[in-house]
Regions:
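Short, glycine-/aromatic-enriched active-site segment of Class I SAM-dependent methyltransferases
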Residues: 158-180
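A C-terminal cap/extension of S-adenosyl-L-methionine-dependent methyltransferases
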Residues: 170, 202-269
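A short glycine-rich, Lys/Arg-flanked "PGG" loop and its adjoining helix->strand segment in the class I
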Residues: 139-154
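A short His-aromatic
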Residues: 130-134
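A short hydrophobic/small-residue beta-strand
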Residues: 81, 155-156
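Conserved N-terminal segment of class I S-adenosyl-L-methionine
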Residues: 1-121, 125, 129, 142, ...
Length: 269
């Protein structure tokens, strides 16, 4: 398996820690997610439909900073959660944020390819939200998700949909950020799952009717426009989002794509 710093990954730890997140070592991230929020409800419903609701289930998130999804799965699914984060300061901040919510769980400062579970038990669910699209070749990353799941366990992979309008906008306003993404479609993601001999596709697709969140457009304009102009833009944008609620999920407008796959319990197809 190639190391993520040896050509396959499109980013480095320095990019995330120093350039992108600009981590404030003294600021503990806010974690709580409203499952009914318009930017999250689509994923909440999907996960409720396809993941087990067992309080003894063990979940591992790869690329877990700032810890919101770990908080979410612990709170709404009752899972025993762990996380892997390869930017060491971000791993520590994630641990602090969860501890502030009385969730004391292991957060491993490690590369996902180097991480080995502390016990012989693998995980019932292995997930990532916005990780695999930062690799030029996603096959080793998807394979690693499957290796960490127990036989019969589930793999959940969600990515921002940069194959549609969000990718076009991001390329226009932040070409340097666009450059560190693999602009894969849902079909590309599903094909990568189907190519893995140890995983069976369960469900997936484009999720969300319309949102420009993956393009970073709103924070980009908020920093550059007079506040009255931005307030007008925000009202127009929010109106578009409400109207778009009636659109079908699609490659062009949906903000995210997601797949659920199951690790095979045997070695043959």
């Amino acid at each position: 398996v190639p190391e993520p710093t040896q050509g396959n990954a499109l980013t480095t730890p320095d990019f995330w820690g120093d350039e992108f997140w600009k981590l404030n070592r003294d600021a503990v991230p806010e974690l709580e997610i409203d499952p009914d929020h318009r930017e999250f409800s689509w994923l909440h419903r999907f996960l409720q439909q396809h993941l087990p609701r067992r309080p003894d289930a063990r979940l591992l998130e790869l690329g877990c900073h700032p810890g919101r999804y770990l908080w979410y799965f612990h709170t709404y699914f009752g899972y025993e959660v762990e996380g892997v984060e390869y930017v060491a300061p971000a791993a520590e901040l994630t641990h602090q944020a969860l501890k502030a919510h009385d969730i004391e769980v292991p957060i491993h400062a490690a590369d996902l390819f180097d991480f080995q579970p502390d016990s012989d038990e693998l995980f019932d669910v292995v997930c990532s939200f916005g990780v695999v699209e930062h690799f030029a070749d996603v096959e080793p990353v998807i394979r690693r998700h499957g290796e960490l799941a127990r036989p019969g366990g589930l793999v959940v992979i969600a990515i921002p949909n940069h194959a549609g309008v969000n990718g076009t906008v991001l390329k226009w306003i932040q070409p340097e950020v666009y450059a560190v993404h693999n602009h894969m479609s849902f079909r590309d993601l599903k094909d990568a799952i189907d190519a893995n001999a140890e995983l069976d596709y369960v469900a997936g697709g484009y999720l969300g009717h319309f949102s420009l969140a993956p393009s970073n457009l709103c924070p980009h304009l908020r920093q550059r426009l007079p506040w009255k102009v931005y307030a007008l833009f925000e009202r127009i944008y929010n109106g578009c989002v409400r109207v778009a609620h009636y659109l079908p999920n699609s490659r062009w407008f949906s903000p995210n794509a997601v797949v659920v796959a199951r690790r095979r319990s045997h070695d043959t197809r």
